Each structure stands twice: as structure tokens, then as C-alpha cells.
Swiss-Prot record:
Cofactor: Mg(2+)
Membrane topology: Peripheral membrane protein
Chain intervals with Polar residues compositional bias: 29-45, 66-80, 94-104, 1137-1146, 1226-1235
Residue spans of biased composition, Basic and acidic residues class: 736-777, 1081-1090, 1276-1293, 1474-1489
Record-listed Phosphothreonine modification sites: 351
Name of the protein: Microtubule-associated serine/threonine-protein kinase 1
Organism (species): Homo sapiens (Human)
Region (Disordered): 23-80, 94-117, 139-171, 340-374, 717-909, 929-965, 1065-1184, 1200-1293, 1305-1570
Tissue: Expressed in fetal brain.
Residues of the PDZ domain: 967-1055
Length: 1570
């Protein structure tokens, strides 16, 4: 035996060889000349094992190469390994070999290794081998069935890819030696092949022939040439193996299959000829090499094992000779293929109608698309080469994005070939994370590419609006981009221009990669290329020395003009991840040269402290930003990146099913506000319009028109549908209606059409459980599978629709039901992938359209729909769900008259803005016309992440109720109703978001409640017809007490709801409460005058109820106190800044309810749910003075709620905060008076991310924080005392205590006694306070983002004149220690959607920034730049009591707290403020401002009521004129209480004491005018 063989076998650890088997190789006959070629070996190649079986063949499908990625470092080390098993081996057409798979997924490649199952006997086949062999030898059929018909050579004694465990050096040596033998024995064959390959590539390379008109075929053509070049290079380098030829053949067959499947062009014949030529060129060398490498001994043992297995499996009968004849094919039917073809033909469509249809469809699909097929809607964005427009296909009504590239630009820049590359890549790519193209065509001046429209804008705009992204959001976006990149790289595509601008966000919140204008097409991935030398070659694939891309994202090797390849994309990915997490790129400079210098030489700067990145993220970015492309993560393939620890818990296969944190909310189907048009930088609209370029343009441009298979599919399906349903002309928006058609054969098609295109729906289609619904869902699912871009309408799964009992009427509080889209005529976008998730609306009796038509100042066409005249929804309304998502910005603006509001008699449909949460509901007949539990939660929504749902503008956090009882009327006997209710938390699935519900905890035996039929354990849904879910406990108690001696309670059995009882939440401290919006009816305002004084006291309670005694005065009338400890407000963690304070109704609207203060919570605060009380960041503490306490304007206006900014809260009750500046108004009393406004459109605010959600890393916020640190020193030495909780605290002491907790300060407790600020001796500016509705929760008090020493810009005259005739307003100025004046916008509040001309609006926007999550900030910030701000709203203004008399404005007090300063004169007739001890307390009640007298004395009844302006005020008040409510004494106001705003409603006139009002002899004469 030769020494070399012994050396090779010495490492082979196989103890149980049968005797003599080790020496079998040496006894085999070999010629002497072959031995001399390979040293002293007895084999034609290097030593090889006696059997393939020790080789690494997967024992299960999981081990098979198709599921294995060779890039795993663990399985693909370049370290030396044992060489005993010199031959790698696998069967030729082994089903699990990885070749039958899609080549691009051949990242997943062979895992054949020589190092596993060494314990097996040499000739013992594995289960997989036996299965394959029995199939191969046991039947006359080819083995190709499992591989989709792909055929491979009959026997392949070698594996098809590199053994992962083998060292490349020894492997390459083996290949080189084999090639040496091969060339020596067959010199002519090798030379012939190389020469033919050279001629082939030269003759057919894309530069030598006209580009193919079909994008798919053009891409395949390019790949064929690349494969031929690669084969030529490998042959010259002596690296060719049989395995390589096998893979080359497989890839060519795969490309050919793609060509046939995905192209309808006649050019397929050209591609077929190319493939055939290339296969013929390589066929002879491949055969010779296979013969040279053939090992008969291996084959013999293989055959033995197969025969044995076949006999055991009864595949071989006893008649062996007949079996052999059959195996040789001598008994085969000569015409099986013909028969098979006939069968196929007969299996097709035999009916003439179907034949005609298919013919028509194919002819339709062949019709070339052109510019006339599309209507341009608007510009989406501009770029360097052209512009992108939103267009709609005229026939299918489907929306697309059309990229128009100016031909002259391309010709002048010599970029025509690049346009074809982009077209080919977009057409060929079929991946959920890559934008798909539908067709391309040329016009006289442009090349046009029609792509899917991705609605959510790009990541660059998102970053610009919100700064750094939360880690989870960045991880998901990055991971989806990795998958897109992996797909492209497998097809040899290098993007070269990766940046956030090219990552688009779909309507479901996922990522799509776009813009391949700079991309290069290289060689598709080959598993045989996974060795060290090729990785280096791959990294230097392109040697064009082009420096192209966006400077901040260009890799060092491109800057240095070295060769580059796929690693340049991984460098850009590192920059992108850094930008996602930090908010800016790591390298920047004033010039590209300076920037490139940093890229090549500088280190990365990492944020530190609170803003430090997670360790895994930092490691990942560092690995991606390696200057050397060979060591850069991803150079060996995307698998290196995917297995990084940063993605440890990520499910790579379920990314698309993952709930996105940010889901775009579109105003309409044509909303492009998420995009930056960049019109300031680029302008392509009329460029080159004067020139006629058609004469001189290159001939290849005429080949640009193509139609992708996906467009053909969509177009033909829409045409087919349109044949079944006649079109009606498009009527005026809002007036056309589609009558319910009779049930017939077409209904099935119509149902499908509705699912695909979002056409208007017949009302009966939405009856629960009807076949139409099921059909709709099915068509949705098929559309989702078949299309790269699912329609918006198809994105919702109507999982909650099929149970009619779960549909109940919603509450009136959902303003969204007011807004209606017109029904689309049947010619409306069938293919409109904008398709609305169709939502039916019903409008009950008594609902007038007058209120609707005045809901907006300028209703958009199509926004309003004529109401149904009857209570049942006979007039169907298919409502655009995109409108509903943002409906709160388009409804009931501030000047809608209360009396014009529709009554509650008709149920309306609640829409959820959540993408997967709630869908359409059919209102049930409800005695109250509304139900709090009307939103059926689909199981998906219950388990979904609340973060994206929180960004929805309107949501009903209520479990589904299968049936409501009729209301139970309870007559009070004495002081008791005889039942106890309790508030419970109901969590949304697995999330930390909960809503508050109320159950009957106990019913007294023999009490009124029991007699009325109330049962313990029932869920209370309504009290007196008003839904109570989402109300906090005190609100429900108030609601019950307001009803006097009789209360109507509607309940439902607990088991009939979808609420399930589970274990206590461990992380309950992180919980966030979802609050609902309430809107009282107009009747309440009039009846409230007759309420008892008890309710007036409740009304006067201060803002934040102290839980332990919030209702202590009511214990005797209702046994509610015992339910408080169990209520959701009880037991908040000590670190919560609002521990033991409970927001009452209004804080729900301001999002200030006390919940999680956990800084770890990154769930965005929803406008509809209440924001958590975030701990105020320490760097932002010390702003002086604190934001003033919120007030609530009328609930009827609060459809849109802005959560209170986290900056407005103090970190803890024990921390000191500075006293307010001198120019403070009486009414403000140190606390924010914020007035949530009904937003007409998204408020134009740009907000930083709350620090509690993620450490803010945006540069803007850093600057803001550093500026605000100036205020910290001021607050450090100010006195701050612990808040006292006992009732015995005296009023003055109580006020003093509160100066340390201004955000929790009560208005009534500090009626104007502002303590002087010591050390601030500047002259005190007199402040005036504008009366009327105070809209903005943001613009009151000192601006939190304004530094101590900065002064506000002056208020413009336009701003002083409110549209409703409000009084002129002068912001008070306060002087800081530095001598600079700080102008504080205390009185001049504005509705947020009003565009102001001075700087105050910007400051208010800055404040608001912290109130929302980054996701919601993007919602609001984008609208200011898109120019789509809503119509300005007119604030409600209180009219004076008598003509000529102006309102008294409460004034701030100076150092002398016992006297009032002179008010700043507003007009000649403005009366002077009361002197002496008379003080006015400002209170907002039901949209009116009430000025009531001193706390101890009731007001004089000399107020003459006078109504407000008709369009602004409720109906005339008929209450007695003495309705000014005295402020209750301090003993009745708990330390944390506040007025229960909304329980009583006063006349407008009581808000304005007339001139000359006499109180205890103190007259208020009018001061002289200014």
C-alpha cells in the first residue's frame, strides 16, 4: 500500500471496518501510467474512501442542502480538516441536493461533508439514500418528479458543493490536480471549450446585441452570459469539477424555466437558443471529466445497496430478468409522451366560453401599455434623473407609481444602459421586500416605469421627522432589508445605492427596497463558489472604477477605486443601521472629499450614557463597517448577518407576519403626504419640452417597452371581472349609489371583485356569515398570494365579521362615523390596490346631514355622503378605511353648533384604525343607539402588539359582546341603589394596554337593584344610555349620581363577552390605559342647571382625584368606596409620578391618566389611548415655570386627543420645582390649562421622541436638552416640599406644598395667589387672558422647549384677531435673571391646526413633539411639510353680557397677594378687575369659561344670560340666571381633586361678568382705553 494512502487514512476514525476492507482500494486494478500521474496513489484522484456513506448526506430534509446555508461559519470553516475522506459524494439527482430549488435560494446549498455519521458501516446506506435509490432503480419513471421536472445526469458520484468541513487549500489542490490530469489527457477538449466560450460571450454579451424588450428575458440573457464568463475563468484557472458542470447545467435550466414561466414574449426563443448553445459547448468536457472522476467501486456498492433495498421494499419481483429488461427501458411504450400531451390537452377548458375568455385575456395582456392607459394624479417625488408620479390605470382603476426618466438626460449622461438594468431588475425581482414593476414604456420624451405604489413614504422622511428609531423598529426594518439584499445578491445584483431614501414603508408598515438606477448585475450565486479565493474574487467583481452612490453610504473600496462587489451593500447597511439607531450618519463632511477622508480613516463615534446603543447593535455596525471588504460581515453571504446576535430572537421566516410599529395612516387613496416631493432640489416637470428628441435617440431606447407577468395577470383578471359586471358612469362624488343587485350568478364574481378592487359593496354582502363574506375573504387571500403588492382592501382579514351576534351598535363617541366617503361607482378602481377595506355605515333616524356638512369648514369633495332616510342601512356606504384612520382630523371642527349634532338614535359603525384590529360592524338594534362593546376584537388584534394600534386615531378598546339586555331601571330608595360596582382592567391580548370596564360586584339582597333584576357579576355597558367602558371609576359613579332617584343600567352577562379571566400581569406597572373619547349631548348642558349642589361640588373638584378619598363625600349615597382599591387606579408603583392621583374625565382626553412611567416602555402613546405619565427626563427638569395644568374644553370637541407631553410632568412629588414667573395669570394657578381640540387635520407638529420610550438621540433634541439645562440651576435652590395627603392641611399650607408639584396643582386651591419670585426684581408685566375656548394644550405657560433666557417672537396682529372675534391678546413677558424677557403665551392659545404666522406655532409644535411616540410624530410632522394642514378652526368666544361691555379678564397677582393689579386695558369699555379680596376663579365647563367669585361667597345673581353666536353656541340657556357656581371650600376639595368638568353645563353668559357687576359693594368701573 502506498505511503500517501496511509497518510491520508491515518486521520480516519472508523474503528469497525470489516476485515480487509481498508485494503480493497489497493487491490483494485489500476494502470501504471495513471499511478505515475498522481504521485504514488492508486486512484485517478487523491485518496478516496471506499464508500460514499461516511460522507455528509442529510439524514432528514432538515439536513438536506436545500435547507442548509453553506455560509454558516460553524459549518464552513476554512481551518484545515481531516483529509481521509478525500472524495465527497452524493447522488446525481438526489432530491435534497439543492439543485431542484430556486437557484437564488441556493444560499441554501449543499451540506455534503465528509465528517458525519462516521460510526456507520461503510456500506450501510442512510434512509434518504435508500428512499432515493429505491425510487431511482425501482421504477421506470425518472426521479425528476420531486424537482419540478428538472432532469439531472443519471448518476453523480460527487456532491454538488464544497464540503463545509474541508479546508480550501487542500480542496483547491485536489481540483487543480484533477484539472491537470484532465488537461493532460484531453487537451483538445479543454482548448476547444475555452475558445467556444470566448466566442460565445463576445458574440452574445448584452453590449453586443440589442437589449431584449422583455425585462425578464433581458435579465436572464445577462445571467447566461455571466455564467459563460465564469465557466471560462474557472477553466483557465483549473478550478473546474464535475460538480461545477452539474450546477452550471442546473442554473441554466432554472433560468430557462423562469423565462418560460414569467415571460410571454416571443424573445423566449432567443434565450432558449443561448442556453442550448452554452450546454453544447460544455457537454463534451463535462462528460470526459465525469468519466475521469468516476469511481466504479463506489458505484458498485451503491448498486448493491439499492438492489437490496428494492427487494426488501417489494419493488423488485422475483422475476429478476424481467426487472432488468424493464430497467433497461426495453419494454417502454414508445408513445407515452404523446399520450401524456393529449391528456393535458383534454384536461383543459373544453367549453367554448372559456376558450373565448382565455383568448380574449391573452390578447388583452398582449396589448402594449402606454401613457394613455394611465391618469396622472399627482407628483410623489423628484430625483436626479426624473420624477415619480402617482397614477391610476384607466381600465382597472389601480394605483401605481410611475417613474418618468427624461430621455435626453440619459443620453447626455450616457446612462441608457443603466435604465435598462433598472427595468430588468425590477421586472425580474419577485420578492416581498423588493418593489415590483408592472410595465415599462417610452413616450416622446420619457422612459416610464410603472411600479407598485408604496404608500408610507421612505425611511429617510421618517428619520427626518422623528429622529432615531426605537431599537425594535430599527431591527425589523433592517432585517427586512437584509432579506431583500439576500435575494438580490443571490441573483448577482449589487444595489450600490442603499440608503434610507430607497427603503419604502408599505401600508402594513413593512419595508420594500427600490431604486435600482445604479445597480450592477453580476454573477448569480453558485454553491461551488464558496471557497476562499472566490470570496475575494466576489469582493472585486466589478473593476469599472466608478465612484457612484450617495457619498455618505459609499464603501471605502469604491472611494479608493479598487474592485468592488456585493460587500459594498453591506457597508451601506452598516451606515443605515447606525442612522436608524442614532439619527444621523456616522461620517459626514462639508465636501465629498472631506467625507471620503473620514470614511477611509476615521473611527466611528458612538453615543454614550443614556443614548448608548445596545452592545449587539454596536458590534453588528462595527462588523459591517469594516474597511477591508474581505473581513466585512456579509462578504461570505447574508447568512453571516442573519445569524448575528443582534437578531438572536428574530423569526426570519415570520417577518411579514410581524406587527409593524409604524403603520401609515392615509387621508385618502391619493394621499402622498408621507413623501417629500423634493421640488426645491429637482424640477423635471417641463424639462426639455421644447426639444424633439425622437430623431436622434439611440435605437435601443425603442426596446424599452415591456410588460411584466404580474401586470398581465392583474390586467387580465380585471378585464375578466369587468366583463361580468357592467360599468356605470362615474357620478358626482358623494351622490352616486349602487343599488343592491339581485342575487344571481354574477354575484360570486362581484364579491370577488369587491375583494380585489375595493368597489362599492352591496349592503347585503356584509350580513354576517353570508357566503359573500366568505367569498370575499377567499379572494383576498388569493390576491395576497398572487400579488407582490396586496391591495389595501385585501390587507384586512375580516376575521371578526362572520359572527353576526358580535356586531352591536357603537357609541356615539366615535366621531369617525360622521365622515363618509361616497360610494364608488362600479367603474371605480377594481384593481385599485388602494382599495378600501370596505366598511358599511348606517345612520339612524333623526340623523341629519346638516351637522355633517358643517363638520368641516371646507368639506372635501367626496367626504360627505347623503344620509340614509331610514334607520336600516338601505343606502350602502363603502367607506374608505384610509379616511377613517385619520377621521378625527377631518370632522367636527370647533365651530360646529351643538344643537346641530345628530342625535344618538341611530347606531354607527366603529372603525378601527388598526391595520389588523377591528373591521366593519353592522350595528345591532340598540335601545340606546350606542354600545361601548361594539368592536369585535379579532383574535389577531387581541394578540397583536399594541404599539401600532396605539397610533390609530380612533379605537374602541372594548371586548365583543354577543348580546345586550334591555336596560334595568333602578329606583333609589333613600340613599342607596343597592349595588356595588367595581372597575376592572381588561388587557388587550398579551399587551400591556388595557381598558377599564365596570362590573356589578355585589347586589344587596332585597335592595332596589335586586328588585330591578340586576345580577352580580354582570358587565355594565351603559348608564342612562351612555356607554361606560373606558371611563374611570369616579366617572361612572358621577354618571349614576347625576341621574337622581332613577338610573337605567344596561348590563350583559360576563360570559357573553370576549373578556377572559387570566392571571395577574407581572409587568402591570408598565400597563397603559386606553381611554375613550366622550361627548355629551346638547341636552345635558341644559339640564345640568337643575342638578343638586352636590354635583356642582363635584364639578369644582380639582384635576387629579386622590384615590383614597376621591369620593369620600359620596360614600353614603353609593357604596363605591370599597371598589376603589380594586379599581385600575389603585396600587400604582411608587415610582410613578402620579402615584395615588387619578385623572378624572378630562385627563383622558389629554392622555394624562396615570399609568406606566417605565422608561423601558417603547409603546407609542396613542391619541386615542391615554399616554403614560412619563418620568420627566432629568435634563429637561427645571423648566420654569412648569406647564400649567390641563383643562378640558367640551368633550364634544375632543375627538382627537393630544397626550400631555412627558416634558410637562415632574419627575416625582418630592422634587422641587421653581415657582412661576411673575407674569402669571390668576386663572392658570401654576398648572397647565390645556384644551384638547378637535383636530381637523393632523396638527403640524414635529416632536422629539419621549425619553421614556427610547433614549432620544436626535441632534435636535440634544440641543434642546442642553439649552434647557440652563433652567435646572434655577430650580435647584427653589423650595419644594413633600405633598401632604391629609385632609387637615390648611389652605395656605396646602398651596405652599403644591408649589413643588405644579403640574398637579389645583386651580381652586390657589385662586390667584401666585407667590412672588424672589430675586426677580424686574418690572412685572401685566398679563391679559383671552376669554372663550382655550384650544391648545401646548401653548400655555412657558414653552418647555424655550430656554430660560430666550424671548418669544412678538404676536402678529393677525394672530391677535381670532377668527371668531376673540379679544386681542398680549402675551405676558417675564424677565429672567439674565435680564432678558421671556414672553409667555398664557392667554393666547390657539387651535393646533390653525397655521399661525409668528413663531408661537412652531414652539407649540416643539412642545407637542414629546407627547407622542416617534411613530405618531411622523403622522403629524409630515403634514406640515406636505401642505395639507386642515382648515383653520374658529375658537369659541364668549359674548359680553351687554352690548358695549367687555369681559373681565383675571389678572396675575404681584408680590402683594392680597391685591389685584390693574388689568391691561383691552378696549375703552373694559371694566377694571375687582379689587380687595375679590378674586375670580377661572373654570372651563362644557366649552364655556366661567368666572366665579371668591370661594366663600356665592356669586351675585345679576347675570343676564345671552346666547353665543348661533354657529358656535348651544341652544339658548333656559337656566336661572344665578347659575354661577361658588367654589366649594377647601375642606371639600381633596388635595388632589379637580373640577369634574362636563358634569354641569352653564349658560355662556355666566362666563362673563358684565361691566359694573357689584359684589359686596365693590364696583368695577371700566378703565380708560389704551
Amino acid at each position: 500500500m502506498s505511503d500517501s494512502l496511509w497518510t491520508a487514512l491515518s486521520n480516519f476514525s472508523m474503528p469497525s471496518f470489516p476485515g480487509g476492507s481498508m485494503f480493497r482500494r489497493t487491490k483494485s486494478c489500476r494502470t501504471s501510467n495513471r499511478k505515475s500521474l498522481i504521485l504514488t496513489s492508486t486512484s485517478p484522484t487523491l485518496p478516496r474512501p471506499h464508500s460514499p456513506l461516511p460522507g455528509h448526506l442529510g439524514s432528514s430534509p432538515l439536513d438536506s442542502p436545500r435547507n442548509f446555508s453553506p455560509n454558516t461559519p460553524a459549518h464552513f470553516s476554512f481551518a484545515s480538516s481531516r483529509r481521509a475522506d478525500g472524495r465527497r459524494w452524493s447522488l446525481a439527482s438526489l432530491p435534497s441536493s439543492g439543485y431542484g430549488t430556486n437557484t437564488p435560494s441556493s444560499t441554501v446549498s449543499s451540506s455534503c461533508s465528509s465528517q458525519e455519521r462516521l460510526h456507520q458501516l461503510p456500506y450501510q446506506p442512510t434512509v434518504d439514500e435508500l428512499h432515493f435509490l429505491s425510487k431511482h432503480f425501482g421504477s421506470t419513471e425518472s426521479i425528476t418528479d420531486e424537482d419540478g421536472g428538472r432532469r439531472s445526469p443519471a448518476v453523480r458520484p460527487r456532491s454538488r458543493s464544497l464540503s463545509p468541513g474541508r479546508s480550501p487549500s487542500s480542496y483547491d489542490n485536489e481540483i487543480v490536480m484533477m484539472n491537470h490530469v484532465y488537461k493532460e489527457r484531453f487537451p483538445k477538449a479543454t482548448a476547444q471549450m475555452e475558445e467556444k466560450l470566448r466566442d460565445f460571450t463576445r458574440a452574445y454579451e448584452p453590449d453586443s446585441v440589442l437589449p431584449l424588450a422583455d425585462g425578464v428575458l433581458s435579465f436572464i440573457h445577462h445571467q447566461i452570459i455571466e455564467l459563460a464568463r465564469d465557466c471560462l475563468t474557472k477553466s483557465r484557472d483549473g478550478l473546474i469539477t464535475t460538480v461545477y458542470f452539474y450546477e452550471l447545467q442546473e442554473n441554466l435550466e432554472k433560468l430557462l424555466q423562469d423565462a418560460y414561466e414569467r415571460s410571454e414574449s416571443l424573445e423566449v426563443a432567443f434565450v432558449t437558443q443561448l442556453v442550448k448553445k452554452l450546454l453544447i459547448i460544455i457537454s463534451r468536457p463535462a462528460r470526459l471529466l465525469e468519466c475521469l472522476e468516476f469511481n466504479p467501486e463506489e458505484f458498485y456498492h451503491l448498486l448493491e445497496a439499492a438492489e437490496g433495498h428494492a427487494k426488501e421494499g417489494h419493488l423488485v419481483k422475483t422475476d429478476i430478468p424481467r426487472y432488468i429488461i424493464r430497467q433497461l427501458g426495453l419494454t417502454r411504450d414508445p408513445f407515452p409522451d404523446v399520450v401524456h400531451l393529449e391528456e393535458q390537452d383534454s384536461g383543459g377548458s373544453n367549453t367554448p366560453e372559456q376558450d373565448d375568455l382565455s383568448e380574449g385575456r391573452s390578447s388583452k395582456a398582449k396589448k402594449p401599455p402606454g401613457e394613455n392607459d394611465f391618469d396622472t394624479i399627482k407628483l410623489i417625488s423628484n430625483g436626479a434623473y426624473g420624477a415619480v408620479y402617482l397614477v391610476r390605470h384607466r381600465d382597472t382603476r389601480q394605483r401605481f407609481a410611475m417613474k418618468k426618466i427624461n430621455k435626453q438626460n440619459l443620453i447626455l449622461r450616457n446612462q441608457i444602459q443603466q435604465a435598462f438594468v433598472e427595468r430588468d431588475i425590477l421586472t425580474f425581482a419577485e420578492n416581498p421586500f423588493v418593489v415590483g414593476m408592472f410595465c415599462s414604456f417610452e413616450t416622446r420624451r420619457h422612459l416610464c416605469m410603472v411600479m407598485e405604489y408604496v404608500e408610507g413614504g421612505d425611511c429617510a422622511t421618517l428619520l427626518k421627522n422623528i429622529g432615531a428609531l426605537p431599537v425594535e423598529m430599527a431591527r425589523m426594518y433592517f432585517a427586512e432589508t437584509v432579506l431583500a439584499l439576500e435575494y438580490l445578491h443571490n441573483y448577482g445584483i449589487v444595489h450600490r445605492d442603499l440608503k434610507p431614501d430607497n427603503l419604502l414603508i408599505t401600508s402594513m408598515g413593512h419595508i420594500k427596497l427600490t431604486d435600482f438606477g445604479l445597480s450592477k448585475m453580476g454573477l448569480m450565486s453558485l454553491t461551488t463558489n464558496l471557497y476562499e479565493g472566490h470570496i475575494e474574487k466576489d469582493a472585486r467583481e466589478f473593476l469599472d472604477k466608478q465612484v457612484c452612490g450617495t457619498p455618505e453610504y459609499i464603501a471605502p473600496e469604491v472611494i479608493l477605486r479598487q474592485g468592488y462587489g456585493k460587500p459594498v451593500d453591506w457597508w451601506a447597511m452598516g451606515i443605515i443601521l447606525y442612522e436608524f439607531l442614532v439619527g444621523c450618519v456616522p461620517f459626514f463632511g462639508d465636501t465629498p472629499e472631506e467625507l471620503f477622508g473620514q470614511v477611509i480613516s476615521d473611527d466611528i463615534l458612538w453615543p454614550e450614557g443614556d443614548e448608548a446603543l445596545p452592545t449587539e447593535a454596536q458590534l453588528l455596525i462595527s462588523s459591517l463597517l469594516q474597511t477591508n471588504p474581505l473581513v466585512r460581515l456579509g462578504a461570505g453571504g447574508a447568512f453571516e448577518v442573519k445569524q448575528h446576535s443582534f437578531f438572536r430572537d428574530l423569526d426570519w421566516t415570520g417577518l411579514l407576519r410581524q406587527k409593524a410599529e409604524f403603520i401609515p395612516h392615509l387621508e385618502s387613496e391619493d394621499d402622498t403626504s408621507y413623501f417629500d416631493t423634493r421640488s426645491d432640489r429637482y424640477h423635471h416637470v417641463n424639462s426639455y419640452d421644447e426639444d424633439d428628441t425622437t430623431e436622434e435617440e439611440p435605437v435601443e431606447i425603442r426596446q424599452f417597452s415591456s410588460c411584466s407577468p404580474r401586470f398581465s395577470k392583474v390586467y387580465s383578471s380585471m378585464e375578466q371581472l369587468s366583463q361580468h359586471e357592467p360599468k356605470t358612469p362615474v357620478a358626482a362624488a358623494g351622490s352616486s349609489k349602487r343599488e343592491p343587485s339581485t342575487k344571481g350568478p354574477e354575484e360570486k364574481v362581484a364579491g370577488k371583485r369587491e375583494g380585489l378592487g375595493g368597489l362599492t359593496l352591496r349592503e347585503k354582502t356584509w350580513r354576517g356569515g353570508s357566503p359573500e363574506i366568505k367569498r370575499f375573504s377567499a379572494s383576498e387571500a388569493s390576491f395576497l398570494e398572487g400579488e407582490a403588492s396586496p391591495p389595501l382592501g385585501a390587507r384586512r382579514r375580516f376575521s371578526a365579521l362572520l359572527e353576526p351576534s358580535r356586531f352591536s351598535a357603537p357609541q356615539e363617541d366615535e366621531d369617525e362615523a360622521r365622515l363618509r366617503r361616497p360610494p364608488r361607482p362600479s367603474s371605480d378602481p377594481a384593481g385599485s390596490l388602494d382599495a378600501r377595506a370596505p366598511k358599511e355605515e348606517t345612520q339612524g333616524e333623526g340623523t341629519s346631514s346638516a351637522g355633517d356638512s358643517e363638520a368641516t369648514d371646507r368639506p372635501r369633495p367626496g367626504d360627505l355622503c347623503p344620509p340614509s332616510k331610514d334607520g336600516d342601512a338601505s343606502g350602502p356606504r363603502a367607506t374608505n378605511d384610509l379616511v377613517l384612520r385619520r377621521a378625527r382630523h377631518q370632522q367636527m371642527s370647533g365651530d360646529v353648533a351643538v344643537e346641530k349634532r345628530p342625535s344618538r338614535t341611530g347606531g354607527k359603525v366603529i372603525k378601527s384604525a388598526s391595520a389588523t384590529a377591528l373591521s366593519v360592524m353592522i350595528p345591532a338594534v340598540d335601545p340606546h343607539g350606542s354600545s361601548p362593546l361594539a368592536s369585535p376584537m379579532s383574535p389577531r388584534s387581541l394578540s397583536s402588539n399594541p404599539s401600532s394600534r396605539d397610533s390609530s386615531p380612533s379605537r374602541d378598546y372594548s371586548p365583543a359582546v354577543s348580546g345586550l339586555r334591555s336596560p334595568i331601571t333602578i329606583q333609589r330608595s333613600g340613599k342607596k341603589y343597592g349595588f356595588t360596582l367595581r372597575a376592572i382592567r381588561v388587557y388587550m391580548g398579551d399587551t400591556d394596554v388595557y381598558s377599564v370596564h365596570h362590573i356589578v360586584w355585589h347586589v344587596e339582597e332585597g335592595g332596589p337593584a335586586q328588585e330591578a333584576g340586576l345580577c352580580a357579576g354582570d358587565l355594565i355597558t351603559h348608564v342612562n344610555g351612555e356607554p361606560v367602558h373606558g371611563m374611570v371609576h369616579p366617572e361612572v359613579v358621577e354618571l349614576i349620581l347625576k341621574s337622581g332617584n332613577k338610573v337605567a343600567v344596561t348590563t350583559t352577562p360576563f360570559e357573553n363577552t370576549s373578556i377572559r379571566i387570566g392571571p395577574a400581569r407581572r409587568s402591570s406597572y408598565k400597563a397603559k390605559m386606553a381611554r375613550r373619547n366622550k361627548r355629551p349631548s346638547a341636552k345635558e348642558g341644559q339640564e345640568s342647571k337643575k342638578r343638586s349642589s352636590l354635583f356642582r361640588k363635584i364639578t369644582k373638584q380639582s384635576n387629579l382625584l386622590h384615590t383614597s378619598r376621591s369620593l369620600s363625600s359620596l360614600n353614603r349615597s353609593l357604596s363605591s368606596s370599597d371598589s376603589l382599591p380594586g379599581s385600575p387606579t389603585h396600587g400604582l408603583p411608587a415610582r410613578s409620578p402620579t402615584h395615588s392621583y387619578r385623572s378624572t374625565p378630562d385627563s383622558a382626553y389629554l392622555g394624562a391618566s396615570s399609568q406606566s412611567s417605565s422608561p423601558a416602555s417603547s409603546t407609542p402613546n396613542s391619541p386615542a389611548s391615554s399616554a403614560s405619565h412619563h418620568i420627566r427626563p432629568s435634563t429637561l427638569h427645571g423648566l420654569s415655570p412648569k406647564l400649567h395644568r390641563q383643562y378640558r374644553s367640551a368633550r364634544c370637541k375632543s375627538a382627537g386627543n393630544i397626550p400631555l407631553s412627558p416634558l410637562a410632568h415632574t419627575p416625582s412629588p418630592t422634587q422641587a420645582s421653581p415657582p412661576p414667573l411673575p407674569g402669571h395669570t390668576v386663572g392658570s394657578s401654576h398648572t397647565t390649562q390645556s384644551f384638547p381640540a378637535k383636530l381637523h387635520s393632523s396638527p403640524p407638529v414635529v416632536r422629539p421622541r419621549p425619553k421614556s420610550a427610547e433614549p432620544p438621540r436626535s441632534p435636535l433634541l440634544k440641543r434642546v436638552q442642553s439649552a434647557e439645562k440652563l433652567g435646572a440651576s434655577l430650580s435647584a435652590d427653589k423650595k419644594g416640599a413633600l405633598r401632604k395627603h391629609s385632609l387637615e392641611v390648611g389652605h395656605p399650607d396646602f398651596r405652599k406644598d403644591f408649589h413643588g408639584e405644579l403640574a398637579l396643582h389645583s386651580l381652586a386651591e390657589s385662586d390667584g395667589e401666585t407667590p412672588p419670585v424672589e430675586g426677580l426684581g424686574a418690572p412685572r408685566q401685566v398679563a391679559v387672558r383671552r376669554l372663550g375656548r382655550q384650544e391648545s394644550p401646548l401653548s400655555l405657560g412657558a414653552d418647555p422647549l424655550l430656554p430660560e433666557g430666550a424671548s418669544r417672537p412678538p404676536v402678529s396682529s393677525k394672530e391677535k384677531e381670532s377668527p371668531g372675534g376673540a379679544e386681542a391678546c398680549t402675551p405676558p413677558r417675564a424677565t429672567t435673571p439674565g435680564g432678558r424677557t421671556l414672553e409667555r403665551d398664557v392667554g393666547c392659545t390657539r387651535h393646533q391646526s390653525v397655521q399661525t404666522e409668528d413663531g408661537t406655532g412652531g414652539m407649540a409644535r416643539a412642545v407637542a413633539k414629546a407627547a407622542l411616540s416617534p411613530v405618531q410624530e411622523h403622522e403629524t410632522g409630515r403634514r406640515s411639510s406636505s401642505g395639507e394642514a386642515g382648515t383653520p378652526l374658529v375658537p369659541i368666544v364668549v359674548e359680553p353680557a351687554r352690548p358695549g361691555a367687555k369681559a373681565v379678564v383675571p389678572q396675575p397677582l404681584g408680590a402683594d397677594s392680597k391685591g389685584l393689579q390693574e388689568p391691561a386695558p383691552l378696549a375703552p369699555s373694559v371694566p377694571e378687575a375687582p379689587r380687595g379680596r375679590e378674586r375670580w376663579v377661572l373654570e372651563v365647563v362644557e366649552e364655556r369659561t366661567t368666572l366665579s367669585g371668591p370661594r366663600s361667597k356665592p356669586a351675585s345673581p345679576k347675570l343676564s344670560p345671552e346666547p353665543q353666536t348661533p354657529s358656535l353656541a348651544p341652544a339658548k340657556c333656559s337656566a336661572p340666571s344665578s347659575a354661577v357656581t361658588p367654589v366649594p371650600p377647601a375642606s371639600l376639595l381633596g388635595s388632589g381633586t379637580k373640577p369634574q368638568v362636563g358634569l354641569t353645563s352653564r349658560c355662556p353668559a355666566e362666563a362673563v361678568p358684565p361691566a359694573g357687576l357689584t359684589k359686596k359693594g365693590v364696583s368695577s368701573p371700566a378703565p380708560p382705553g389704551p
